């Protein structure tokens, strides 16, 4: 199963960092947010990733192209140029898709269609962390038999709010400020989801696609009661770094 990660946003609410790098490369404990997300997936056996790039996407490519030699001990034979890595390399296979700087999220996901094929896949945002059990999430999706499953979080937030009955979304409203179950990312999606994406891609996945999935009874909601956070502002970034430095890395399931 592949994990698709949305990495293209401009991160305007975190300009202290994102003037120079894309938000998924903002550091937590010396490693990018994106690295932490990928390690969560890796712990549950997901090693194939599709990164949907946009703003400063080349920085994400550079990070991973340089990753092994920067983060591992190595032996260099200067006479032959041969390099031997001494550490344990990551077993990731990463596809970097340039999806456009201003492309909306539905359009970014649509561009991944040819790389996903006819299999169920995982999707999340490049700024969200959770100690979610992906085995349970995937099993729940299979049990419900819906086209899509979203992780639902109990939180007062600026994120999308779901009305849920018997584990299925009845309505989806993006970015309200009321109490409720919010969109926590960490989706499981069947290829049927692509039928809900406009061919021009000119919309947010969190707008008409999710609303229509809910209306058609095709959006299941997996309730996660553990740790979850979205690193939406510089203050959020400082908070999770404080947690990391104090040994409270509750999302560190690996």
Swiss-Prot record:
This is Probable glucose-1-phosphate cytidylyltransferase. Binds 1 Mg(2+) ion per subunit. The gene is yfnH. Its EC number is 2.7.7.33. It catalyses: alpha-D-glucose 1-phosphate + CTP + H(+) = CDP-D-glucose + diphosphate. It comes from the Bacteria. Its cofactor is Mg(2+). InterPro entries: G1P_cyt_trans-like, NTP_transferase_dom, Nucleotide-diphossugar_trans. Belongs to the glucose-1-phosphate cytidylyltransferase family. It holds the Pfam family NTP_transferase. Substrate binds at residues 6-13, 23, 103, 108, 126. It comes from Bacillus subtilis (strain 168). The keyword DNA damage does not apply. Catalyzes the transfer of a CMP moiety from CTP to glucose 1-phosphate. GO terms for molecular function: glucose-1-phosphate cytidylyltransferase activity; metal ion binding; nucleotide binding. SUPFAM superfamilies: Nucleotide-diphospho-sugar transferases.
